[in-house]
Amino acid sequence: MNLAIDVASGEKPLEELVSGAISALQENKDINLILVGNEKNISKAISKTKYDHNRIDIRHTDEIIDMNESPANGIKHKKNASVLLAARLVREKEADGFFSPGNTGATLAAALTEIGRLKGVMRPPLISTLPKLNGEFCMLDMGANVDCTTDYIVQFAVMGRVFAKRYLKIDNPRVGLLNIGEEDSKGNANTKKSFERLQKMKKINFIGNIEPNDMLKSDSVDVVVADGFDGNIVLKTIEGTASFVVNLLKEEVKKNPVSVMGGLMMKPVFNNLKSKMSSDSYGSAILLGLNGGAFVGHGKTSGVGMKNAVLNMYKFLDAKINEKIAKELYDSGAKRRIF
């Protein structure tokens, strides 16, 4: 499997990202990498690592869409930007999927313009896995579509169900609609209408509304469906809360000598908690419903995050989730009505 990796974007040094990507090769012998960025810098970075020359290719470009740059402006004026070149490799069938830890808007735009949507998909959503007490659940949309119609939400539910079955290996995933209360009558006009539509879909194990405070419980839900505005807020709140709690505990521990002694023994627990909630642990969010794999990383993606992103790319593509989505949308009656 060939994976195109934009190592020129993001906030971490190129050398760290290259090292992380190459470390994934040691764990999966079926992965080949196409590293996109400045050839001289990439060659220098990989010369410091042990790797199989036959499994790594380099595609040179000096153009980068900066983190604070307008995605539309970058896509228009930088035709050979690293993220565009990586996505183009998927379109041209040289790669099965691409990953970028750079400008999120530019990554989404590159995926849509270069790879394109599956027939029947109205709006590709961003999906990601998140930890809960006894495992994982997935949530979509995480920010690709801020304004969503009921039709979009219904499609997200179908796509999320496919993802949970094939990626998380859950036979009959429970699908919940993110809302401000569990009652059927809760929510705005769009969530109420979405609730009614989802309740009528026999192929979906719809459990009703799910409140944000219930998502992380051990036995609550497997797929959380939301519009991109609410989904992105929930994601960032979870990440921020996890970091806050860990830092708060550390500050409390420092207040007296006895706590310091206990804190030293608890340090592995604190680090494990922080690691589980870190964006590096799940590597990337995935843009579903495309004619190829598109994976969006956090700007702060580290070498560890890059390694996990590459391994998760393989897991997703090997499960042929996008191919299954096209069939499920048609079978469920949630396909796009006008092509």
UniProtKB/Swiss-Prot annotation:
Its EC number is 2.3.1.274. Keywords: Cytoplasm, Lipid biosynthesis, Lipid metabolism, Phospholipid biosynthesis, Phospholipid metabolism, Transferase. Transmembrane segments: none annotated. It is found in: Cytoplasm. One of its GO terms (molecular function) is phosphate:acyl-[acyl carrier protein] acyltransferase activity. Pathway: Lipid metabolism; phospholipid metabolism. It catalyses: a fatty acyl-[ACP] + phosphate = an acyl phosphate + holo-[ACP]. GO terms for cellular component: cytoplasm. Disulfide bonds: none annotated. GO terms for biological process: fatty acid biosynthetic process; phospholipid biosynthetic process. Gene3D superfamilies: Isopropylmalate Dehydrogenase. Its main location: cytoplasm. HAMAP family: PlsX. Belongs to the PlsX family. Catalyzes the reversible formation of acyl-phosphate (acyl-PO(4)) from acyl-[acyl-carrier-protein] (acyl-ACP). This enzyme utilizes acyl-ACP as fatty acyl donor, but not acyl-CoA. This is Phosphate acyltransferase. It comes from Brachyspira hyodysenteriae (strain ATCC 49526 / WA1).
